[in-house]
């Protein structure tokens, strides 16, 4: 009980001490917030651009290579390999919920035209890859002669896929890339809120540490 009372008294003393140091606290907070504002000003042109790539049609190669139970993950890996062979401009990641591949880029907004050029290259390369996959798939089907292979489920699926290729002339439409989602790399609201919280912590800790140092020096002097 006495120890609890002592802790309460210590807490009240600390609060009174901080109240006396309110000017110091406000001054440190002002410096911290000024640094946050400077940071936001320096990085005002930094943006994050996100594209979403949706695969509308599988390919014979994906059908052969990927397990149907984990088709999206395998399909994503193969598509990402194609993208990374073309460009390292984007960071790719699977969006399992929406069954899409996210392509992200961060940088100065003046480089946005470069990002648009790169995404066009990505789309053209994937379409070319799809066309090549279907061409190779048809060749494989033409070469298959054994009855067991012809009567297999995989053969039937590949026949279905290659015939459906007419729905995507020259590969157009086999993938869809969304319009870019553009936002600030460092959102002002989040940075200001985080900066305000940290400024309070830093200023209070500064005052408490200074109080401990002063008390230690006084005790050492005595």
UniProtKB/Swiss-Prot annotation:
The chain crosses the membrane at residues 22-42, 189-209. It is found in: Cell membrane. Keywords: Cell membrane, Membrane, Transmembrane, Transmembrane helix. It comes from the Bacteria. GO terms for cellular component: plasma membrane. It is a multi-pass membrane protein. The keyword Transmembrane applies. This is Uncharacterized protein YkgH. It comes from Escherichia coli (strain K12).
């Amino acid at each position: 009980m006495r120890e609890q009372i002592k802790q309460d008294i210590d807490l009240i003393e600390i609060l009174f001490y901080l109240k006396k140091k309110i000017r110091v606290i406000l001054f440190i907070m002002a410096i911290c917030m000024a640094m946050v504002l400077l940071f936001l000003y320096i990085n005002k042109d930094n943006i994050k651009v996100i594209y979403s790539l949706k695969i509308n049609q599988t390919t014979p190669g994906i059908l052969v290579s990927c397990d149907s139970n984990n088709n999206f993950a395998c399909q994503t890996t193969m598509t990402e390999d194609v993208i990374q062979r073309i460009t390292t401009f984007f960071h790719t990641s699977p969006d399992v919920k929406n069954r899409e591949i996210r392509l992200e880029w961060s940088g100065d907004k003046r480089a946005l035209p470069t990002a648009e050029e790169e995404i066009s290259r990505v789309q053209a390369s994937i379409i070319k890859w799809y066309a090549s996959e279907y061409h190779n798939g048809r060749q494989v089907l033409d070469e298959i002669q054994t009855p067991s292979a012809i009567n297999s489920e995989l053969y039937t699926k590949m026949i279905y896929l290659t015939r459906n290729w007419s729905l995507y002339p020259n590969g157009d439409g086999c993938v869809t890339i969304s319009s870019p989602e553009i936002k600030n790399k460092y959102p002002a609201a989040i940075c200001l809120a985080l900066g305000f919280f940290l400024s309070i912590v830093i200023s209070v800790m500064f005052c408490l540490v200074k109080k401990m140092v002063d008390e230690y020096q006084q005790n050492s002097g005595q």
